[in-house]
């Protein structure tokens, strides 16, 4: 009888080892398969470097001092009204008053077709990109940040509270404004 229990235990231990190896293999596969995406998500949330703000072009574009040279940043996930558009100057002024002559932390996401660094900026640990949407000075730019639903939540709340540009009736999104401007030329 003692021999049977030993055999069963050995079989059980062998099966456990096989499951552990299978599970370890699955974990390695998943890490390799999703690792790049996971890295992108992490990079988006960790500021990389501090820069001095030189000037603000509009509600979603600014220039910083990069050790003596200028670096143009386009805020990730948002689209602010154009300067010539209703609420464009207010959007620019809000951003300017928030970050003028300040040191901001920047997380770089990518480059756009104009060579600007698509970035998330932070001032004293506050995500300024999110702030622009939360306070009604920019739209959630779904086309380029479709998975970042927090911007959508902030936009919805700003609309409900009629904050910023949402205090106007039927504000025109910047992408539509630019498209209409092109077709008129």
Describe the role of every protein-language-model region.
Residues 2-185:
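Small beta-barrel nucleic-acid-binding modules, primarily SNase/OB-fold domains
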């Amino acid at each position: 009888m003692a021999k049977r229990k030993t055999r069963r235990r050995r079989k059980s231990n062998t099966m456990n080892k096989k499951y552990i190896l299978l599970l370890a293999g699955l974990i390695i596969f998943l890490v390799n398969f999703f690792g790049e995406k996971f890295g992108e998500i992490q990079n988006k949330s960790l500021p990389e470097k501090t820069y001095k703000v030189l000037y603000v072009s509009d509600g979603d574009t600014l220039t910083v001092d990069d050790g003596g040279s200028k670096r143009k940043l386009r805020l990730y996930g948002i689209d602010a009204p154009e300067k010539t558009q209703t609420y464009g100057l207010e959007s620019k002024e809000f951003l300017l008053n928030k970050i003028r002559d300040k040191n901001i932390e920047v997380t770089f996401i990518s480059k756009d077709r104009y060579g600007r660094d698509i970035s998330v900026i932070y001032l004293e640990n506050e995500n300024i990109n999110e702030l622009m949407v939360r306070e009604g000075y920019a739209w959630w730019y779904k086309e380029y940040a479709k998975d970042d639903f927090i911007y959508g939540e902030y936009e919805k709340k700003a609309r409900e509270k009629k904050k910023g540009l949402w205090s106007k009736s039927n504000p025109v999104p910047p992408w539509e404004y630019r498209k209409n401007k092109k077709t008129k030329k």
